[in-house]
Amino acid sequence: MALKGTQIIASEFRASGDRGFAAVNPVTGALLEPRFREACYDDIDRAAKAAANSFDQYRMLPMAQRAIFLEDIGSELTACAPELVARAHIETALPEARLEGELARTVNQLKLFALMVKQGSFVAARIDRAAPERRPAPKPDIRTMLVPLGPVAVFGAGNFPLAFSVAGGDTASALAAGCPVVVKGHPAHPGTCELAGQAIVNAIRKNHIPPGIFSLLHAQGRDAGAALVTHPEIRAVAFTGSLSGGRALFDLGCSRSEPIPVFAEMGSVNPVFVLPKILADRGPSLAEGLVESITLGVGQFCTSPGLIVAIRSAALDQFLESLKSNLEERAPGVMLHEGIKKNFLDGLNGLQKIDGVSRLDSSRTQLDGCEIVPALLRTDALTLLDTPEIAGELFGPAAIVVVCDSRDELLVVAESLAGQLTASVHGTKEDLRGFHKLFGILQRKAGRLIVNGFPTGVEVCPAMHHGGPYPATTDSRSTSVGTDAVHRFLRPVAYQDFPQELLPEPLRDLNPRKIWRMVDGDMSTDDL
């Protein structure tokens, strides 16, 4: 399919404005065709209003039709897989095999949400039947369920051009909830965005879905994003990216005359605690696994382990040598774009200027273009505690080892950390018993705790929680992966003393779809 380089507004391609930009091949530095038009305020306004105008019609569609629509988005993505993967490869430099896996994840994610919608229990129906004979006051009939919020603005991520982008988890969960979406595509891979957007449009047309439920806007600067978040028709925002970007959008959402929730997934250093006994028993193999995790995807994962905490010992010295040698064997990688590389090098250089921080690897010369070599740093607990910015996210293939003098000092380091997406602990059974206090600390700090594993894999399943306390996210109760992601875009409504014919189907006495409901305090799929 020939790329058009225009906005998609209410499922129609629309060209407006004279300003534009082109994607850049990170490997060659060449500009890629075509040029993409910058969204103007009129585009943003049209998209938001179209979403609002389609909301009631979309949310009232039968759940079965909504589920088929989600499945068909996955089918349309699969149908254009060769073209989609090829374009994503030249726009991001990510290997085609990695992109094929990411596409499969994206499609399976849509299928998972379709299954959830088809089953229907996600609306969390609760029924407390009337008790008119109750004294001193009769009990009313009260029934509650979750309903969609309204149009959602989705900001695509740069590091996952498929799974966290136009047809990714935020879009899938919003559509599953019954909310229209207006996507601001990531400017580093606009062609990939357009192809995914076309797949959604094809599914909309195939299923006779209101066209206003989907729009895709292209823009490089922050002005378009700000205009989208502050548009009065937008009811929620989903964002994956930097702390500065996410916080700016969060502040905009809060500053509106009618504030809206901004679910931003932002910075995380994903600490890994390596305990003494396992360090002595399995140091070299742990080092190999850690380096694999640190350098996976050129370190451009929000779950990349950036902080390794251990207690001083001879085994630690050997472990550090293994880390160093494994890291130095890694070939340079190509980062997503020059902006990410610049931020990485600026952060790395800043860390190396701090007294008490040293470089462990051989400090290979950094390369031109978007190529990068990984880095390994070392500091001690006191330096980290005196300079907490050391524990900030450095987005790229680097990690810093924090050497502690005792178990108590390791616990103090854990207590000093800000909110995280993940926290990992490697230890033997004896280690884990001896450091049980560590888990109590980490439970307050992170959204996902891992024992004897690495954080970079994020399984797409109902039990997954991909979130964490600030600054990992703006709302530690929310997740952007797994079926619970749908709850970001739902709110409860209670119906008191409603006649059956006015109640939403999930709250009526008859339960033909056999969804799970809480009835008078007990879970049931029965009719009443």
Question: Residue ranges of each PLM-predicted region?
Answer:
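NAD(P)-dependent aldehyde/semialdehyde dehydrogenase
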Residues: 4, 288, 310-421
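Structural signal for hydrophobic packing residues in well-ordered secondary-structure cores
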Residues: 55, 59, 74-81, 85-88, ...
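N-terminal Rossmann-like NAD(P)+-binding subdomain of aldehyde/semialdehyde dehydrogenases
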Residues: 1-140, 527
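Short, glycine-/Ser/Thr-/acidic-enriched flexible segments
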Residues: 14, 159, 188, 221-223, ...
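C-terminal core of ALDH-fold dehydrogenases
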Residues: 367-372, 407-503, 523-526
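Short loop-to-beta-strand entry elements in the cores of soluble alpha/beta enzymes
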Residues: 69, 179-192, 213, 260-277, ...
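Rossmann-like NAD(P) dinucleotide-binding subdomain of oxidoreductase/dehydrogenase enzymes
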Residues: 121-292, 313-317, 527-528
